[in-house]
UniProtKB/Swiss-Prot annotation:
Belongs to the glycosyltransferase 1 family. Bacterial/plant glycogen synthase subfamily. PANTHER family: ALPHA AMYLASE DOMAIN-CONTAINING PROTEIN (PTHR45825:SF11), GRANULE-BOUND STARCH SYNTHASE 1, CHLOROPLASTIC/AMYLOPLASTIC (PTHR45825). Gene3D superfamilies: Glycogen Phosphorylase B. CDD domains: GT5_Glycogen_synthase_DULL1-like. It comes from Thermodesulfovibrio yellowstonii (strain ATCC 51303 / DSM 11347 / YP87). This is Glycogen synthase. The keyword Glycosyltransferase applies. Keywords: Glycogen biosynthesis, Glycosyltransferase, Transferase. It catalyses: [(1->4)-alpha-D-glucosyl](n) + ADP-alpha-D-glucose = [(1->4)-alpha-D-glucosyl](n+1) + ADP + H(+). It comes from the Bacteria. Synthesizes alpha-1,4-glucan chains using ADP-glucose. The gene is glgA. Disulfide bonds: none annotated. Its EC number is 2.4.1.21. Transmembrane segments: none annotated.
Length: 497
């Protein structure tokens, strides 16, 4: 099986969030599984700064059509393998499996998608170029992939291109496509005049094409044309079929529901491993869970809060934004603090909520610690030292923080939505609540405190949480099964098996 992954980002080469983690982890797992996999990425400034010595110019001449113009770019190539210690080995090679699409006007910028002032105004041009460049390179190099797996709106035009502008290309004759929607809230919506950039005319501006309330929607093109659509949890796959979660595309998704699959994300068990974590005060695992208390001591000292080892510490790590439920956390905190609970925050977000968290820290300096920013070492210390983690999201396609928390025996308290429903078992590995309100969150925290005060039951819950396997090894196998099913279906239809 020959597989291509096409994404706007992948760790460690480029990353702004969960998309980069997912694609980077899948690439690594597929290499380990012996899959013939190639990854296509833009050659961003941050990639050039960190990996310029690991790539070689492929010396391929190609032109990517953008509207009436053809723009030319370069390709940088590297060979990626995984050593016995699970580390990526990245070496320059023209026969590599990592292709970087280079175009300085589009990708040589400080940020991937935009600045604090907003998205880059030419994002449509940038990712049309990237998508067309990938396909043009495949043509020139005669790269015959069995499956091209696209990720999010940035590459969602590729399935549409393969069924239209590139349908006569022999190298794509047998290619199947998968499109993963990591978060339906991001769709690549642009003004109507951007349509011509895609290579399509007004014939594509209709309800079953790219038209979306008078605008152009890149993701919609992929949803209609990918052979399989995946999203990042089974529950989220069901939720997005409804108007409440479908972000205007629920009708399209209902038409494709027979081809829609939810696969839970994983976490990197090498990075997130309390038995080997270099950032935490005391390493621990299932065999020495009590050593987790040493990390609680360390966290109390670091945060400068007035809390004993017997007092519960509840953490929040992530974006301080409306979608993540920070508003109901802020509303619930004063009464909870009065009951002896301490809170630890790490993250950034909307200035209003950052200000609210700082206000709470100033009002309750002995019970609230907030780090407005992100520090990797601190995140590890919080996961290891806190007793519980809040994930009260309005919606959550999958969520990674609750998976990391369980890995560290830190009990998640989550709203029952999306991947949180699929990964946290109420009263077994964590606590779930349904209603989106500060009172429902407070009640869930009260249920947690009840178990927390029963040390035997609390220890049992920690053990159950730490036993769960959310490694990428598990998740990647489901994707491989999906690809093989697509290839088998193709071969049955063509009579080759």
């Amino acid at each position: 099986m020959k597989l291509a992954l096409v994404s706007a980002e992948a760790y460690p080469f480029s990353k702004t969030g969960g998309l980069g983690d997912v694609v980077g982890s899948l690439f690594k797992e597929f290499i380990k599984a012996g899959i013939d996999v190639t990854l296509f990425l833009p050659f961003y400034k941050i990639t050039r700064d960190n990996f310029s010595n690991s790539v070689v110019n492929a010396e391929i001449v190609y032109g990517a059509p953008i509207g009436l113009n053809t723009l030319f770019g370069a390709v940088r190539v590297a060979k990626v393998s995984v050593d016995s210690d699970d580390n990526l080995i990245i070496e320059p090679s023209k026969k590599g499996n990592l292709f970087f699409i280079e175009h300085n006007n589009f990708f040589d910028r400080n940020e991937l998608y935009g600045t604090n002032h907003g998205e880059y105004l030419d994002n449509a041009e940038r990712f049309v170029f990237f998508s067309r460049a990938v396909l043009e390179i495949c043509k020139i190099m005669n790269l015959n992939f069995d499956v091209i797996h696209c990720h999010d709106w940035h590459t969602a035009l590729i399935p549409l291109y393969l069924k239209t502008l590139y349908r006569e290309c022999s190298c794509f004759e047998k290619t199947k496509t998968v499109l993963t929607v990591h978060n339906l809230g991001y769709q690549g919506i642009f003004p109507r005049e951007k349509l011509e950039l895609t290579g399509f005319g007004q014939e594509m501006f209709h309800i079953d094409g790219l038209e979306f309330y008078g605008m152009v929607n890149f993701l919609k093109g992929g949803l209609f044309n990918a052979d399989i659509i995946t999203t990042v949890s089974p529950t989220y796959a069901k939720e997005i079929l409804t108007p409440d979660y479908g972000a205007g595309l629920d009708g399209v998704l209902r038409k494709r529901k027979e081809n829609l699959v939810g696969i839970i994300n994983g976490i990197d068990y090498k990075i997130w491993n309390p038995e080997e974590d270099p950032f935490i005060a005391k390493k621990y695992g299932l065999q020495n869970i009590n050593d987790k208390q040493k990390n609680k001591e360390d966290l109390i000292a670091l945060a400068g809060i007035n809390s004993s080892l017997q007092d519960p510490i509840i953490a929040f790590i992530g974006r301080m934004v409306y979608q993540k439920g920070i508003d109901i956390v802020v509303d619930a905190m004063p009464n909870l603090i009065k009951n002896g609970i301490s809170f630890i925050f790490e993250g950034t977000g909307e200035s209003y909520y950052e200000h609210k968290i700082r206000e709470l820290q100033n009002s309750y300096p002995s019970k609230v610690f907030a780090f407005i920013g992100f520090d990797e070492a601190l995140a590890h210390k919080i996961y290891a030292g806190a007793d519980s983690l809040l994930v009260p999201s309005r919606y959550e396609p999958c969520g990674l923080s609750q998976l990391i928390a369980m890995r560290y025996g830190t009990i998640p308290i989550c709203r029952k939505t999306g991947g949180l429903s699929d990964t946290v078992e109420d009263k077994v590995t964590g606590f779930l609540f349904s209603e989106y309100s500060s009172s429902a969150l407070t009640h869930a925290i009260s249920r947690f405190i009840e178990i927390y005060n029963n040390k035997q039951k609390f220890l049992e819950m920690i053990r159950e949480a730490m036993k769960r396997d959310f490694s990428w090894s598990n998740s990647s196998k489901k994707y491989i099964e999906l690809y093989r099913g697509l290839i088998g279906e193709r071969e049955r239809k063509t009579g080759t098996i």
